[in-house]
């Protein structure tokens, strides 16, 4: 039986000239700017044009392009191998769909049709669900399938914030970095979100908190000094906090060894390689930090690949509703943006 796995990620510009078009795609997404097209399009043009110079400097730090596609391809290859080794009576093929740059859903659907699967599994590379990330990617894929009159049995793994293999992957990476440390502050850093999104029922912050809670329990370190914070704030809106930058400043002044964990990113990209590794380290150094360590994103970590593989193969064990498979976790009823509570 042929099965196609669609891996969703954000994407990133493949050269400096594509930074502004990438930003436009990001801000032209209704899940990011919830405005009518007639207003959203020109505003996305304006924002992307104004932010392009700073963003270009960031990508120049990375050699002129984002590494996210190459790294996602490595994850895709590892997952495809694991799936085919584990479930030998099925033929799995993984396809990458980026939301804001290539490869886009409109192009990838042609490759999926050529593969001619009997089943499609949608797997966001976002462990914690947000309408702005997983939700947007899933909707785009469904819209493209509808536009192309493509109807195949499709199942969705909406999120996996407390999956044990995912938790184990983070735990092991953290232990590698802290096993010989003393007087350190473990800072779990996730991408921020405007407070208004959470108030409208987005479960992202709650799910991030559940991930961190499980990892801390799994570490099982007495009197562990840890905190969850949020990075990458932009614009005038009030964002969820506390901010990672503020926490770094505070603990640098206390002469703590800073240990950063990117809890919501599973691939290295500008927010980890530049924001965490360069910009925040400079802030830490300027405030007296003597030691600064960053735990890597999970990438092709064996436990993370196992997590995705088992989520796909064993999905019927935690089936919530027709074609929707959350991993043994249900968001509280006030999070109306959660697909488990608002399933079509």
From Swiss-Prot:
GO molecular function: ferrochelatase activity; metal ion binding
Catalytic activity field: heme b + 2 H(+) = protoporphyrin IX + Fe(2+)
Any one GO CC term of the record: cytoplasm
Pathway(s) it belongs to: Porphyrin-containing compound metabolism; protoheme biosynthesis; protoheme from protoporphyrin-IX: step 1/1
Pfam families in the cross-refs: Ferrochelatase (PF00762)
Keywords, ordered alphabetically: Cytoplasm, Heme biosynthesis, Iron, Lyase, Metal-binding, Porphyrin biosynthesis
Subcellular location: Cytoplasm
Record has Translocase as a keyword: no
Taxonomy, superkingdom: Bacteria
Residues that, per the record, bind Fe cation: 191, 271
InterPro entries: Ferrochelatase, Ferrochelatase_AS, Ferrochelatase_C, Ferrochelatase_N
One Gene Ontology biological process: heme biosynthetic process
Enzyme Commission number(s) of this protein: 4.98.1.1
Entry's family note: Belongs to the ferrochelatase family.
Biological function: Catalyzes the ferrous insertion into protoporphyrin IX.
Name this protein carries in UniProt: Ferrochelatase
